[in-house]
Curated annotation (Swiss-Prot):
Subcellular location: Cell inner membrane
Protein name: NADH-quinone oxidoreductase subunit N
Keyword Transport: yes
Gene that specifies this protein: nuoN
Species, as recorded: Cytophaga hutchinsonii (strain ATCC 33406 / DSM 1761 / CIP 103989 / NBRC 15051 / NCIMB 9469 / D465)
Domain of life, source organism: Bacteria
Subunit structure and binding partners: NDH-1 is composed of 14 different subunits. Subunits NuoA, H, J, K, L, M, N constitute the membrane sector of the complex.
GO terms assigned for molecular function: NADH dehydrogenase (ubiquinone) activity; NADH:ubiquinone reductase (non-electrogenic) activity; quinone binding
Length: 457
């Protein structure tokens, strides 16, 4: 609750920074504040659970996922600061919108009432509708914003209808009451299904993924980085929290639906990604396939399943942020992110090539990176639940992903150098990239810390 209030105040301060003479100071203020808020939030992990006005709950789950979301926001601010150096974008307004979106994400992982679920989704999404189209003279960016807004509004309508039906069946917006009064009323199950469809849109599960490639490729790359990491973590955290708050075990019909969605998302996402020759668009479809892996544990409402989801999301978010940052560097230098523009990067900038390779290896699930352990732990949980065929599909999908991830890696190290990058990573940014890359390896080699956190949420 305190983190939500503090980041909200920080967003308002950023929005007013030009008027109160803090334009040059707002960036360090945001960084220092986020570090302080992250530290404060993490220190409350072992506190007793608290409910605020029956709307928000402060417990280990909200603290763990909230800390992960704040960490993603902090890394985003550090990595993509250079995006505002040209003066094309209003720095204070953009920073404020990102912070407000962060508030929405924190609400989504701590709600205990359906009204707060809806508010969290809207607070998260509305700033991103604006940011996706912030490159006003670029028709692709404008198209991205319009598509995201229209389809996002459609998903919101489905969510509202689901909430209304659940309220009609149970007479309450409170999840604790819904859990006690849930019955065989068809309205209740239709409502849950509609809510699940709305979340499937937010996490880009097939067949609700059709907006992803156009929105991600059309939006400014630094906004794509935020959407593909922060939004995905917040949406998955909220989706699992909703199911865990209502059911002791997922109903059979919903379990089979989620398994089918997971398998379809893995297959379609990986096959579509393998046909892309633009790395940014490839990462968009890769994000779709990654959503399929995460959905595998949703029919399993156990502590270990929750832990595997948390660990996987942490590794995915860090690796994806690194990859998209380097895509932006190449885009600025070469004009776009086609695979051939990465040719020879291993010779012209070995550091960038190495960290990009490491992030792609992690996304592919190859040891010793975080992605390998995340997939291993996740697959193990699904096998224990008896869904062996789903794991076989996931393994096949992972094998397909090796092809398109390594297509970029091979181009970097075996291709002829096209030209030297005009905007290579340097200074503080390179230090942060090194730290994030180290985290990708350390999570893979020493996952015990994240496992301990996960087992207590």
């Amino acid at each position: 609750m305190n983190a939500i209030i503090l980041i909200s105040v920080l967003g308002i301060l950023s929005m007013m920074s030009e008027f109160i003479g803090l334009k040059k100071l707002i960036y360090p203020i945001i960084l220092i504040s986020l570090i302080g808020i992250l530290g404060y939030n993490a220190c409350t992990f072992w506190n007793n659970p608290e409910t605020h006005y029956g709307m928000l709950v402060h417990n280990n789950y909200s603290v763990a996922f909230g800390s992960l979301l704040i960490t993603i926001t902090l890394f985003w601010f550090i990595l993509f600061r250079s995006s505002y150096s040209s003066g094309e974008f209003n720095q204070g307004d953009h920073y404020a919108l990102i912070l407000f979106s962060t508030v929405g994400g924190l609400v989504l992982v701590s709600f205990s009432n359906m009204s707060m679920l809806f508010l969290g989704v809207e607070i998260l999404s509305i700033p991103l509708y604006i940011l996706a189209g912030s490159r006003k003279k670029d028709l692709h960016s404008v198209e991205s914003s319009i598509k995201y807004f229209i389809l996002g509004s459609f998903a919101t309508g489905i969510m509202l209808l689901g909430i209304a039906l659940i309220y009609g069946a149970t007479g309450s917006f409170d999840f604790a009451t819904i859990e006690k009064t849930a019955s065989a009323d068809p309205l209740f199950f239709i409502g849950i299904t509609l809510l699940s469809i709305a979340f499937a849109f937010k996490v880009s599960a097939v067949p609700f993924h059709f907006w992803v490639p156009d929105v991600y490729s059309g939006a400014p790359t630094f906004i794509t980085a935020f959407m593909s990491t922060f939004v995905k973590v917040a949406a998955f955290g909220a989706f699992y929290l909703m199911l865990d708050s209502i059911f002791e075990s997922v109903p059979t019909y919903l379990s089979h639906t989620l398994i089918g969605l997971s398998a379809l998302t893995i297959v379609v996402g990986n096959i579509a990604a393998s046909y892309q020759d633009n790395v940014k668009r490839m990462l968009a479809f890769s994000g779709v396939s990654q959503a399929g892996y995460m959905l595998m544990v949703f029919p399993i409402l156990t502590i270990s399943a929750k832990t595997s989801l948390f660990v996987y999301l942490a590794g995915y978010a860090i690796a994806n942020l690194i990859a998209i940052y380097i895509v932006q560097v190449v885009e600025k230098s070469k004009g776009d992110a086609r695979v051939e523009n990465f040719s020879g990067l291993g010779k012209s900038n070995p550091f960038l090539a190495f960290v990009l390779s490491l992030s792609l290896i992690s996304l592919a699930g190859i040891p010793p990176a975080a992605g390998f352990f995340g997939k291993f732990y996740l697959f193990t949980e699904v096998i224990h639940a008896g869904n062996i065929y789903l794991v076989l599909i996931a393994i096949l999908g992972s094998l397909i992903s090796v092809y398109y991830y390594f297509k970029t890696i091979i181009a970097m190290y075996s291709g002829e150098e096209v030209s030297t990058l005009t905007n290579p990573a340097f200074g503080f940014t390179s230090v942060i990239l090194a730290i994030m890359s180290a985290l990708v390896v350390l999570i893979g080699l020493f996952p015990d810390i994240l496992l301990q956190i996960g087992m207590n949420i």
